[in-house]
A protein has these predicted regions:
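Phosphate/nucleotide-binding beta-alpha loop and adjacent structural elements of enzyme active sites
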Residues: 2-249
Length: 249
């Protein structure tokens, strides 16, 4: 694949076109926003008095938009590294005074990193994709690489004056969840709730699997609140799920 200026421009145009199509599907309620589960998350936030959401791996803002449509009116801080996805996220957030977009990846430490851009945008990852992922989602192959800035959960908390005890930390980073948690440092056990996408099969090379991730969360005092199954391979084997964990008050 050529990395010249013409190819780079074509890749950006291709990504923006796909994002525009997804935006249209969202308006027709056909987007991948997982509306029913998002409403359940919003109810949990309301019941627990949480007024801030750190949306790590925001893509085009479908998670934040789903929360708003579900009645959540607190602060949302959405981090998205890819330029094309971030442009759509920024467009959605700019009229909402309590929705703050951040153009950066989130990881173990600040810096820069190359991220692989997937054909479907939302499967993009810092990690290499495995064949198991491609078999389960053939439209997710990588088509480009983009250099992006990296921040940490701890930095975002400090920058925005976040109170972790009233905050949901949501992480959807395509296999990079363990690195995001590492970047939270000592804050990990202080967030009131966490929502993560976990994998039962290695979909990205070197990623932490669901069993270990859930064990780490339990060690930090979290219990399972709810779970939504994600996508499966052609045989019906479950590959991913979203889990919501909370601290006991």
């Amino acid at each position: 694949m050529s990395n010249g200026p013409d190819q780079s421009l074509k890749n950006r145009v291709r990504e923006r076109a796909k994002l525009a199509i997804r935006g249209g599907l969202h308006r027709l309620d056909l987007d991948v926003s997982k509306g029913v589960y998002t409403r359940q998350v919003a109810r949990t936030l309301a019941a627990r008095g949480d007024d801030t959401v750190l949306d790590i791996g925001a893509n085009v803002g479908q998670y934040g938009l789903g929360l708003r449509r579900s009645g959540y009116d607190g602060r949302i801080i959405s981090c998205e590294p890819l330029s094309g996805a971030y442009a759509e996220l920024e467009r959605r957030a700019h009229r909402d005074p309590h929705w703050h977009p951040v153009n950066a990846a989130v990881g173990r430490e600040p810096g820069e990193v190359d991220i692989h851009v997937a054909a479907n945008s939302y499967s993009s990852s810092i990690l290499e994709m495995t064949q198991a992922h491609l078999d389960g989602a053939p439209d997710s192959a990588y088509v480009a690489v983009e250099r992006v800035a990296v921040t940490t959960v701890a930095e975002v908390v400090e920058r925005f004056g976040v109170d972790p005890a009233r905050t949901l930390l949501k992480i959807d980073t395509q296999g990079y969840e363990a690195e995001v948690l590492a970047g939270a440092g000592d804050l990990l056990g202080t967030f009131d709730a966490l929502q993560l996408e976990v994998s039962f099969v290695e979909l990205y090379e070197g990623q932490q699997l669901a069993e270990q991730t859930i064990a780490v969360l339990r060690e930090h005092g979290y219990r399972l609140q709810s779970l939504e199954t994600g996508f499966s391979d052609p045989s019906g084997r479950l590959l991913q799920a979203d889990v919501l964990v909370v601290r006991d008050h």
